[in-house]
């Protein structure tokens, strides 16, 4: 465009069909689709592949008997179904899906790791 975004070109992944549509803004959601298949049967994930952490591990335990929370204590906020393994950012269920939130969760994960190490 002339100094600002005027249109975007969209391509259908299945058909390959392209179309140009008018647009003044563009928001990129890179983490909107988690790529966590490699974690299947390792940590608990929802039906969309987002990693379940913290208190959600305990409240959703009846739905996922194959990966129950194994300890008597409650999981730390970013802890996965594997004690001492943490998830942060867009890959985590119910995260904000924003860069600033992901950065904050990364810092929070460090604090969770320190808490975990103090417990062991």
What kind of region is each of these model predictions?
Residues 66, 71-82, 88-120:
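A conserved FAD-binding loop/helix module that cradles the flavin
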Residues 23-24, 81-83:
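Short, proline-enriched alpha-helix->beta-strand connector loops that line the catalytic pocket
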Residues 1-59, 63-71, 115-119:
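A Rossmann-like FAD-binding core segment of flavoenzymes
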């Amino acid at each position: 465009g002339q100094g600002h975004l005027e249109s975007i070109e969209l391509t259908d992944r299945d058909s390959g069909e392209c179309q140009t549509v008018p647009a003044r803004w563009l928001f990129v959601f890179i983490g909107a689709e988690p790529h966590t298949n490699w974690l299947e049967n390792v940590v608990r994930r929802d039906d969309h592949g987002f990693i379940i952490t913290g208190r959600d591990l305990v409240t959703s335990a009846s739905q996922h008997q194959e990966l129950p929370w194994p300890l008597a204590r409650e999981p730390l906020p970013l802890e996965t179904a594997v004690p001492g393994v943490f998830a942060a950012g867009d890959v985590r269920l119910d995260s904000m899906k924003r860069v600033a939130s992901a950065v904050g969760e990364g810092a929070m994960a460090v604090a969770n790791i320190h808490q975990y190490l103090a417990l062991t």
